């Protein structure tokens, strides 16, 4: 029996390390794509992201820059002994991975 993409990704996550982190980002992308596509069961690899990134590389650069600023802000907050109120470092790192992946897949 052939394993599904999600099952393969979950297996990679369970193994940990760098491949597990990338797989975790892809799983997050799959779940979020359900929210961004009106709950339709669309293959996340087939989603047209041009409306989200209308200015090509500039749009991707802006989003990656924004996420990097958030990451740096959260690190500073952590160094000051404070916790994030919402999405933390791991969530922001996963977003950065996915936005970089969107750029590479364009």
Locations of the language-model features?
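Intrinsically disordered, low-complexity regulatory regions
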Residues: 1-106
């Amino acid at each position: 029996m052939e394993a599904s993409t999600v099952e393969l990704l979950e297996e990679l996550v369970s193994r940990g390390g760098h491949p597990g982190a990338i797989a975790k980002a892809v799983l997050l992308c799959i779940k979020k794509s359900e929210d961004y596509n009106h709950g339709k069961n669309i293959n996340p690899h087939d989603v047209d992201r041009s409306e989200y990134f209308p200015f090509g590389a500039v749009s991707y650069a802006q989003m990656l820059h924004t996420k990097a600023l958030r990451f740096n802000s959260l690190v500073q907050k952590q160094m000051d002994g404070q916790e994030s109120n919402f999405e933390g470092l791991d969530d922001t790192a996963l977003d950065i991975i996915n936005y970089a992946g969107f750029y590479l897949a364009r």
